[in-house]
């Protein structure tokens, strides 16, 4: 056994010495194809967009150095980070992370959001006292993509990680939902949440057409477009920040195969453990219980004279388990299309069967304009509308409306590379659980800090 370990170590050292597993800095990870939306990949891109010039020059220089002198010691990245002296002008978390990214062949972002929300009406129809205002949501999400190796013979191996941590103070969004009488929610996470959204190892084979991924993931990462699938950078309301009728897991262990025959086509098929609904832990043991969810996904991303676009279809099925005691089938059709350099239009039609969620159909249409006056890359204007069908088998109030509509608009103003503020207005027309009211409103100010 000792001889085997010695031989294996010698072989690995030889591979690294001769550059077979040499890691060029900032190599593109084909696990997330460039033209196809992936929620956590977009977060990494957004975090690094402001420093693109720095990255390009640093990546070019580092790549040249690495080709001439491959890393020969496991502690070389640590030595190089210390040599860069990222804290020479005082403590700078951003500069330290940039240095770590460069030396470890990774991308790192930490997104922190503070979201106060005011709502009207202030109390539900049967309540005697008003709810406390505002609700304060604190949202932290670290994201890491680490490319382990990249070579013509071995392909690309990478590890991806994302975690979602939600806390509330003063009041919760769930109480606000009840007060204004909606079947949806005023944001993507109405209560305290701990979710391991992503922890996968992916192997992309030479040629970059076939990728196999193992680990914990969620379909939320691909089910959407640029601005209707992430509360931290786009719309806030439940029906505009995700698939409102989704019955799939927030994070579950499984595997999927991705086929990208040409850059504009992305096809996926995979399975997950059916028992993990909220994704609070990484539980491999559930795979032995023989209950799995399955999905198929197709995405087409044409590059036309109008601009880049993406059109995708997702279909999935979930099993009956104690945490979600109903079997469901769901679908989601998405499109996003640039009309010129600044204007982006998007839409979604989604639905699901069963009694797992309050809304079983939803239609979305909206538009957004990023950096409209070329002031700051984080500047963004957005307006959208969603009409959702209420599931009467789940929302069992005596009097409910069949449909609920939300119109939302926001304006994000960037301040430097790390901070943005976003005033936001939601107007709910005909709240489903308040037939006595014609509308309800929610006012928000989102403060984002990106590292």
UniProtKB/Swiss-Prot annotation:
Keyword ATP-binding: no
Known role: Facilitates L-arginine uptake, as part of the AaxABC system. The arginine uptake by the bacterium in the macrophage may be a virulence factor against the host innate immune response.
Cell compartment(s), UniProt: Cell outer membrane
Naturally occurring in which organism (per UniProt): Chlamydia caviae (strain ATCC VR-813 / DSM 19441 / 03DC25 / GPIC)
UniProt KW keywords: Amino-acid transport, Cell outer membrane, Ion transport, Membrane, Porin, Signal, Transmembrane, Transmembrane beta strand, Transport, Virulence
Membrane topology: Multi-pass membrane protein
Gene3D superfamilies: Carbohydrate-selective porin OprB
Name the UniProt record assigns to this protein: Porin AaxA
One Pfam family, short name: OprB
Record-level Gene Ontology MF annotations: porin activity
Record-level GO cellular component terms: cell outer membrane; pore complex
The keyword Transport appears for this protein: yes
Family, as annotated: Belongs to the OprB family.
Entries under InterPro entries matching the protein: Carb-sel_porin_OprB, OprB_sf
Signal sequence, renumbered to the chain: 1-27
GO biological process annotation, one example: monoatomic ion transport
Superkingdom as given in the UniProt entry: Bacteria
